[in-house]
């Protein structure tokens, strides 16, 4: 689709997670961003850490989610706006899986419309590494 990806990810972040599940969740979010962004649009991904919490944001431009669909996006098999979904594929389980993984990790998460696109965000509480240098 020739979309543009802009990544702002620190070289080192520490957080104990179920790696395979967290990778799947982030992959599902990225797949949705790619799937619902028109060719040539920008997708941004960023991660940051503040006070033991990692905040992740994935933003895509070009297509907004209908406001009445936002509360349902994390439900199993829910797909918003069928006119856009006809050619996109998918089962309606991607964001449901994201929800389950985020809940398992006690993370806050959400989706909101911004300007001319969508922002998915999560805030993941993390244990700090033990300093064994003493």
Please name every model-derived segment.
Residues 33-34:
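Short helix-loop "hinge" at the ATP-lid/N-box region of the Bergerat-fold HATPase_c
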Residues 22-26:
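A residue-level detector for a conserved hydrophobic packing site
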Residues 65-77:
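Short conserved segment of the HATPase_c
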Residues 106-112:
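Glycine-rich ATP-binding loops of the HATPase_c
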Residues 4-14:
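Conserved catalytic submotifs in the C-terminal HATPase_c
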Residues 89, 94, 98:
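Short alpha-helical Gxxx[C/S/T] motif in the catalytic ATP-binding
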Residues 40-52:
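Short beta-strand/loop element within the Bergerat-fold HATPase_c
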């Amino acid at each position: 689709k020739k979309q543009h990806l802009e990544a702002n990810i620190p070289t080192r972040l520490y957080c104990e997670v179920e790696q395979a599940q967290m990778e799947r969740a982030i992959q599902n979010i990225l797949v949705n961003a790619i799937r619902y962004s028109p060719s040539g649009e920008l997708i941004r991904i960023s991660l940051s850490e503040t006070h033991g919490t990692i905040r992740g944001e994935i933003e895509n431009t070009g297509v907004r989610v209908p406001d009445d669909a936002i509360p349902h996006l994390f439900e199993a098999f829910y797909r918003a706006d069928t006119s856009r979904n006809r050619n996109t594929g998918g089962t309606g389980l991607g964001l449901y899986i994201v929800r389950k993984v985020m809940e398992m990790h006690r993370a806050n998460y959400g989706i909101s419309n911004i300007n001319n696109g969508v922002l998915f965000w999560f805030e993941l509480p993390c244990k700090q590494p033990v300093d064994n240098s003493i």
